[in-house]
């Protein structure tokens, strides 16, 4: 008689379930069962655990009970118990112990699975992690704090792993390490009108371009200051002399007298810069020396005319690296560590500008020629503001960001008023828009610069919020 297929189905399921149930009974044990081990672990049958174990705790041969493991260097592999935490049983020639080895009656030693040194929280260096754990167990037995791992490698030294991700891909850190020694912090002082006491009024950044102490920075950083002090990365300070200034380009050259050769930065070719390149800005914002920010090049040729500077021949580098007054004058560098610009201007978050290195080269060449020919540098007039020309598109953008922005579409927008300057004394404030001077309409920042050169008194009308305010500013004549 033939048995129907449907009747065979329950029998088939029972046969499939049998090995599964056997596997479940040994759950929690990944190793093959040793001889004499029960089919199912019963924790209630485990012997009492000792309070202290020299080698740490481990599972017995059956994988059921926690027992004291053998310490590092102890025998293992025959009748001895398992090795302790982090240890493995190794027979001569470094072969891990196995069932085959045990059957051949070969004994082994408990060896730490980790061979590199580690530094403990007790300031001691241990040959491996197992020795540190043993020290921690001894410490706890004496009712002292446990010893924890602080770092790989010996105490007091780093662990250099050339194959680690941070070692392979931290190219920004490599650039900073290369350029930082040649970046300087600049502190500026002025004398008080009545007491003649000098007070610090501002700070900025610069970078060394010659081994004998020539330093490039922004013109607005050093102009109208009675004393300029330069601090190197090693903390040494020097008095600096202003050698040359180009206010239109906003580049200045200062010099310190230093014995010995100084580290220098080389200028790259800004004309070869591409949008999307990584750049690093370094400087001293808020007097925090060697502060690093990173970003990409947004565009390589943001023309001064696009910024509303009608008579400007400057093509700025636009970047989203953070630039502010403190790191003005510091270098903007590429990943080769070459200077491709001077940090100079921040319009708003994510929109900053740098003077291209090709302009710096031109300035340094012309400065060398002037000094070689002995030409005197004439005094210049200064009021102490940083400004940009306002256009309808920029006015709309600023109004979207600042609800109280004035309802104007042209003029000179004041980005910053430098402390202790004629502009501050006259009452100008950040975000003011200059709309006329001495009865003449102001359309761009160049209009303001032209009037400053010609006039000794500036009667300004500025738009502040929704009000027009009359302000008088008297420019100062300064040594560039």
Swiss-Prot record:
Pfam families, alphabetized: IGFBP, Kazal_2, PDZ_6, Trypsin_2
EC number: 3.4.21.-
This protein's encoding gene: HTRA1
Taxonomic lineage from the root: Eukaryota, Metazoa, Chordata, Craniata, Vertebrata
Documented effect of changing residue 284 to G: In CADASIL2; partial loss of proteolytic activity
PROSITE patterns in alphabetical order: IGFBP_N_2 (PS51323), KAZAL_2 (PS51465), PDZ (PS50106)
Tissue spec. comment: Widely expressed, with strongest expression in placenta (at protein level). Secreted by synovial fibroblasts. Up-regulated in osteoarthritis and rheumatoid arthritis synovial fluids and cartilage as compared with non-arthritic (at protein level).
Cited PANTHER family: SERINE PROTEASE FAMILY S1C HTRA-RELATED, SERINE PROTEASE HTRA1
Organism listed in the record: Homo sapiens (Human)
Entry keywords, A to Z: Age-related macular degeneration, Cell membrane, Cytoplasm, Disease variant, Disulfide bond, Growth factor binding, Hydrolase, Membrane, Protease, Secreted, Serine protease, Signal
Region of interest (Serine protease), residue spans: 204-364
Organism domain of life: Eukaryota
Name of this protein: Serine protease HTRA1
Domains (record comment): The IGFBP N-terminal domain mediates interaction with TSC2 substrate.
Family stated for the protein in its record: Belongs to the peptidase S1C family.
Subcellular location: Cell membrane; Secreted; Cytoplasm, Cytosol
Site (Involved in trimer stabilization) residue list: 169, 171, 278
């Amino acid at each position: 008689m033939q048995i129907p297929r449907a009747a065979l189905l329950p029998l088939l399921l029972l046969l499939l379930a049998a090995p599964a149930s056997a596997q479940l009974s040994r759950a929690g044990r990944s190793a093959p069962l040793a001889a004499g081990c029960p089919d199912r672990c019963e924790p209630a049958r485990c012997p009492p655990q000792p309070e202290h174990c020299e080698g740490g705790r481990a599972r017995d041969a059956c994988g059921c009970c926690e027992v004291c493991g053998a310490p590092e260097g102890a025998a293992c592999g025959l009748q001895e118990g398992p090795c302790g935490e982090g240890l493995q049983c190794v027979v001569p020639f470094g072969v891990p112990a196995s069932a085959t080895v045990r059957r051949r009656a070969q004994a082994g030693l408990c060896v730490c699975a980790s061979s590199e040194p580690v530094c403990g929280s007790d300031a001691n260096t241990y040959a491996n992690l197992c020795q540190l754990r043993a020290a921690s167990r001894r410490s706890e037995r004496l009712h002292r704090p446990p010893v924890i791992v602080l770092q790989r490698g010996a105490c007091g030294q780093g662990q250099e792993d050339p194959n680690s991700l941070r070692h392979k891909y931290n190219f920004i850190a490599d650039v900073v390490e290369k350029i930082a020694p040649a970046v300087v912090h600049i502190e500026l002082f002025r004398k008080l009108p009545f007491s003649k006491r000098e007070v610090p009024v501002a700070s900025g950044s610069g970078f060394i371009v010659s081994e004998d102490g020539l330093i490039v920075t922004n013109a607005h950083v050093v102009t109208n200051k009675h004393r300029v002090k330069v601090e190197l990365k090693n903390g040494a300070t020097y008095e600096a002399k202003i050698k040359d200034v180009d206010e239109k380009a906003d580049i200045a050259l200062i010099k310190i007298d230093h014995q010995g050769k100084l580290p220098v930065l080389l200028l790259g070719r800004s004309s070869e810069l591409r949008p999307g390149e990584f750049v690093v800005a370094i400087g001293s914002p808020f007097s925090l020396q060697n502060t690093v920010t990173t970003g990409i090049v947004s565009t390589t040729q943001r023309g001064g005319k696009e910024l509303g500077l009608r008579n400007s021949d400057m093509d700025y580098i636009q970047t989203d690296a953070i630039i502010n007054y403190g790191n003005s004058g510091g270098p903007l560098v590429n990943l080769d560590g070459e200077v491709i610009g001077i940090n100079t201007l921040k319009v708003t978050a994510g929109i900053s500008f740098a003077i291209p290195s090709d302009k710096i080269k031109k300035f340094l060449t012309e400065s060398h020629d002037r000094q070689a020919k002995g030409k005197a540098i004439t005094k210049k007039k200064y009021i102490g503001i940083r400004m940009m020309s306002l256009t309808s598109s920029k006015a709309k953008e600023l109004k979207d960001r600042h609800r109280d922005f004035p309802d104007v579409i042209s003029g000179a927008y004041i980005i910053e008023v430098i402390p202790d300057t004629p502009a501050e004394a006259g009452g100008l404030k950040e975000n003011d828009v200059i709309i006329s001077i001495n009865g003449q309409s102001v359309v761009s920042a160049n209009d303001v610069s032209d009037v400053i050169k010609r006039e000794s008194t500036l009667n300004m009308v500025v738009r502040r919020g929704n009000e027009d305010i009359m302000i008088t500013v008297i420019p100062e004549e300064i040594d560039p």
